[in-house]
């Protein structure tokens, strides 16, 4: 490709509204341009990268035995009513009607459509297992799209769905998909972790996320210092270590009119924060017990995913409001505690080990200090309620936990029969009777992969693609002052034609630009290998080679150039 025949839309300045590095660099490199909130046009440079990522995903999916299909983006609403997600999915589901007043949705995912397709096409257990995938546009009407293509409203996704007659068969395919995803992200050159995760609104029994480690990530990824244990912080088990110490002081009621938060209590009364607890009132799961008190240590954070796993807590999770709390308990939010609490109490494991701790007295402006379990208040139900923190023991007993930020680029689920049961997707079983199909679901955010690669691999000059395989071009031929030197122009033209004939993805910068501008543009878009052709070097029989990834520079003899490149490309 010649730059003179290419839409080379690089920017010198970073747009003000671009917050994360990937968004900034994708705009500056001329990869994308905004169309509307959370929606982007992909320019030639960006699309080249996107297609290369897509092709790697397709190759590995095909190797796994999955079969590619394509389903419409527009879906009839009656499928969503049938699956019982029409009401549950919320405003992210874009709903509209056609000219015949028939309701449709713009697909955020394709569980309903694929289940409908398979129930029509598959009738016998002999046709299973079956794994179908597509690479297709999705639309989710995010309330706050941000970070460029990292969290857009319209995006490209690879979604696969498998169908089975047994849990064992599902597990086999799930394991194959787990390995396939690892192969994909390894080929893409990403530093990633597969982590145990919550199944969320999609449902199911088991789930793993594939997280690319990057400071700009929205998820907290937890992993062990000494084992393969890894989990999303939502699912990571918090282990409490040690034994509860014996009381050393009597419980006392203290006036605390100006201490309505843990921070104020710690500062005003010189209490260690680990000797305080916070009591959070949430909606209960039954009419008899409409409110529940959850108690965690003052320096810990409540994990809402874990909380709703307690049978007493309502799902979806919801905090009680101030009026409800005041009416039931008689005190405001800043003065709550487990002593004399008139509603069910659940405490975190770490709280169960505390002694001589401080908490609200359920009287406005007052706290109890030196509270002890089984002396001042009965020990209530104990559960894992908190987020883990760095240094906690790993749940597998090996090492301690580290926490890093991650970008979720893939997610696999064991769905079970949630959709097939609701939509009556059955096959004839071995015994001749109808059997509900068991499903798996496997997604990769293709557009997000591009952004994640940039977040993980860049410098002050621009993008550094982690592998040649996804760079927009593999080699850049950059002739200096070509339009003033016949020898430079002739050699550059011949080299460009030779590289193209050998199947090298090459960009030839034939613009009438200063060398500095040409170098800056090639570095910005991340071309891994740059060949700089100068008149003086040509006279010496040499070409300058620059490696974008390593920063290496060296002079290469003209007659050795092709062999040299063969040894460097894709390394």
Swiss-Prot record:
Signal peptide: none annotated. GO terms for molecular function: aminoacyl-tRNA deacylase activity; ATP binding; proline-tRNA ligase activity. It comes from the Bacteria. PROSITE patterns: AA_TRNA_LIGASE_II. Coiled coil: none annotated. InterPro entries: aa-tRNA-synt_IIb, aa-tRNA-synth_II, aa-tRNA-synth_II/BPL/LPL, Anticodon-bd, Anticodon-bd_dom_sf, Pro-tRNA-ligase_IIa, Pro-tRNA-synth_IIa_bac-type, Pro-tRNA-Synthase_IIa_type1. It catalyses: tRNA(Pro) + L-proline + ATP = L-prolyl-tRNA(Pro) + AMP + diphosphate. It holds the Pfam family tRNA-synt_2b. One of its GO terms (cellular component) is cytosol. Its EC number is 6.1.1.15. It is found in: Cytoplasm. Keywords: Aminoacyl-tRNA synthetase, ATP-binding, Cytoplasm, Ligase, Nucleotide-binding, Protein biosynthesis. GO terms for biological process: prolyl-tRNA aminoacylation. SUPFAM superfamilies: Class II aaRS ABD-related, Class II aaRS and biotin synthetases, YbaK/ProRS associated domain. Catalyzes the attachment of proline to tRNA(Pro) in a two-step reaction: proline is first activated by ATP to form Pro-AMP and then transferred to the acceptor end of tRNA(Pro). As ProRS can inadvertently accommodate and process non-cognate amino acids such as alanine and cysteine, to avoid such errors it has two additional distinct editing activities against alanine. One activity is designated as 'pretransfer' editing and involves the tRNA(Pro)-independent hydrolysis of activated Ala-AMP. Belongs to the class-II aminoacyl-tRNA synthetase family. ProS type 1 subfamily. Consists of three domains: the N-terminal catalytic domain, the editing domain and the C-terminal anticodon-binding domain. Homodimer. PANTHER family: MITOCHONDRIAL RIBOSOME PROTEIN L39/PROLYL-TRNA LIGASE FAMILY MEMBER, PROLINE--TRNA LIGASE. This is Proline--tRNA ligase.
């Amino acid at each position: 490709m010649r730059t003179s025949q290419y839409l080379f839309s690089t920017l010198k300045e970073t747009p003000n509204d671009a917050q994360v590095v990937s968004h900034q660099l994708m705009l500056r490199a001329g990869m994308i341009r905004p169309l509307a909130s959370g929606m982007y046009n992909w320019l030639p440079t960006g699309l080249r990268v996107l297609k290369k990522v897509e092709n790697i995903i397709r190759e590995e999916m095909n190797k796994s035995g999955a079969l590619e299909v394509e389903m419409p983006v527009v879906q009839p609403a009656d499928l969503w009513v049938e699956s019982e997600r029409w009401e549950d999915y919320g405003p992210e589901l874009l709903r509209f009607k056609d000219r015949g007043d028939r309701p449709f949705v713009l697909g955020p995912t394709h569980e309903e459509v694929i289940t409908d397709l398979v129930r029509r096409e598959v009738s016998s257990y002999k046709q299973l297992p079956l794994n179908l995938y597509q690479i297709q546009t999705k639309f989710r009407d995010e309330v706050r799209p941000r970070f460029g293509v990292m969290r857009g409203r319209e995006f490209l996704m690879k979604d696969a769905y498998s169908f089975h007659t047994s849990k064992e068969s599902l597990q086999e395919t799930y394991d194959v998909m787990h390995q396939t995803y690892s192969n994909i992200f390894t080929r893409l050159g990403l530093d990633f972790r597969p982590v145990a995760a919550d199944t969320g609104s999609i449902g199911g029994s088991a789930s793993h996320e594939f997280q690319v480690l990057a400071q700009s990530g929205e998820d907290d990824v937890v992993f062990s210092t000494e084992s393969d244990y890894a989990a999303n912080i939502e699912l990571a088990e918090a282990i409490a270590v040690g034994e509860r110490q014996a009381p050393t002081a009597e419980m006392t009621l203290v006036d605390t009119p100006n201490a309505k938060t843990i921070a104020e209590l710690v500062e005003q009364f010189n209490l260690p924060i680990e000797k305080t607890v916070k009591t959070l009132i949430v909606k209960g799961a039954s009419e008899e017990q409409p409110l529940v008190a959850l108690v965690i240590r003052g320096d810990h954070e409540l994990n809402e995913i874990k909380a709703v796993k307690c049978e007493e807590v309502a799902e979806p999770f919801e905090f009680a409001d101030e009026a409800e709390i005041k009416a039931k308990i008689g005190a405001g939010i800043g003065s709550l505690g487990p002593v004399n609490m008139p509603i069910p109490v659940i405490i975190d494991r770490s709280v169960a080990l505390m002694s001589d701790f401080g908490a609200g007295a359920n009287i406005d402006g007052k706290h109890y200090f030196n509270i002890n379990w089984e002396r001042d208040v009965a020990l209530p139900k104990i559960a894992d309620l908190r987020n883990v923190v760095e240094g906690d023991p790993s749940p597998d007993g090996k090492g301690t936990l580290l926490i890093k930020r991650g970008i979720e680029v893939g997610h696999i689920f064991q769905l079970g029969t949630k959709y097939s049961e609701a939509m009556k997707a059955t096959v004839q079983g071995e015994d001749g009777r109808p059997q509900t199909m068991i499903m798996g679901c496997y997604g990769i955010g293709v557009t997000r992969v591009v952004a994640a690669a940039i977040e993980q691999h860049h410098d002050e000059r621009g993008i550094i693609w982690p592998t040649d395989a996804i760079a927009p071009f593999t080699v850049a031929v950059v002739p200096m002052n070509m339009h003033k030197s016949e020898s430079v122009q002739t050699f550059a033209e011949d080299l460009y034609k030779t590289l193209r004939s050998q199947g090298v993805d090459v960009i030839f910068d034939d613009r009438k630009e200063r060398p500095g501008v040409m170098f800056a543009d090639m570095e910005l878009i991340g071309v891994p290998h740059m060949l700089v052709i100068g008149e003086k070097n040509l006279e010496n029989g040499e070409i300058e080679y620059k490696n974008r990834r390593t920063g290496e520079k060296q002079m290469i003899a003209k007659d050795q150039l092709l062999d040299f490149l063969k040894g460097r490309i894709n390394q």
